[in-house]
Amino acid sequence: MKSLRLLAVGKLKTPFWQQAAAHYLERLRHTWRVTETLVRDGDAALPPAKRNADEGARLLAALGPADIVVCMDERGKAYTSREFAALLDRLTENATAVPCFVIGGAYGLDDAVLKRATLRVCLGPMTFPHEMARVVLLEQLYRADCILRRSPYHH
């Protein structure tokens, strides 16, 4: 069974995002070892740059030296679902390195985290709330798994 990590800022607070994330995590865990690591949100009273830096420091501390860091970033490369599946397949060829998909908080990812990235991926040209972005990423990971297994989920 291949492994992947999801590293994100904060817990999902909205019940329907919690349910959607749990749904895709459950499906993914049938064929993948998925580790979800959440770091604490930055203090909302702080200016956005300071909040981002604090969250970034926590994200960096949670990364392992062998992690293949894939940052979800609006300036990243956009992939079709099939291209993303092929990328996931390539990222998991080496059993000693684990792809770690990183999602920032309300203000995205700090530059220090982006500098640690092996790869930056864009979910699309539109901006999503970070809770929605997490669910979209989980769905796309599940879809990629189905594409790789030739499951009928993706038409």
Swiss-Prot record:
> Reaction(s) catalyzed by this protein?
pseudouridine(1915) in 23S rRNA + S-adenosyl-L-methionine = N(3)-methylpseudouridine(1915) in 23S rRNA + S-adenosyl-L-homocysteine + H(+)
The record's Gene Ontology cellular component field reads: cytoplasm
Q: Does the keyword Lipid metabolism apply?
A: no
Q: Which UniProt keywords apply?
A: Cytoplasm, Methyltransferase, rRNA processing, S-adenosyl-L-methionine, Transferase
Query: In which residues is S-adenosyl-L-methionine bound?
Result: 104, 123-128
- EC number(s) of the enzyme? 2.1.1.177
The family database entries (InterPro entries) matched by this protein are listed as: Alpha/beta_knot_MTases, RlmH-like, tRNA_m1G_MTases_N
| Molecular-function GO terms, alphabetical | rRNA (pseudouridine-N3-)-methyltransferase activity
Q: Which Pfam families match?
A: SPOUT_MTase (PF02590)
Q: Where does this polypeptide localize?
A: Cytoplasm
From which domain of life does this come? Bacteria
What enzyme class is recorded for this protein?
Answer: transferase
Assembly mode: Homodimer.
The free-text function statement in the UniProt record for this protein reads:
Specifically methylates the pseudouridine at position 1915 (m3Psi1915) in 23S rRNA.
Q: Which HAMAP family match?
A: 23SrRNA_methyltr_H
Task: Provide the family line.
Answer: Belongs to the RNA methyltransferase RlmH family.
Protein name as it appears in the record? Ribosomal RNA large subunit methyltransferase H
Species, as recorded = Nitratidesulfovibrio vulgaris (strain DSM 19637 / Miyazaki F) (Desulfovibrio vulgaris)
Give the classification, highest ranks.
Answer: Bacteria, Pseudomonadati, Thermodesulfobacteriota, Desulfovibrionia, Desulfovibrionales
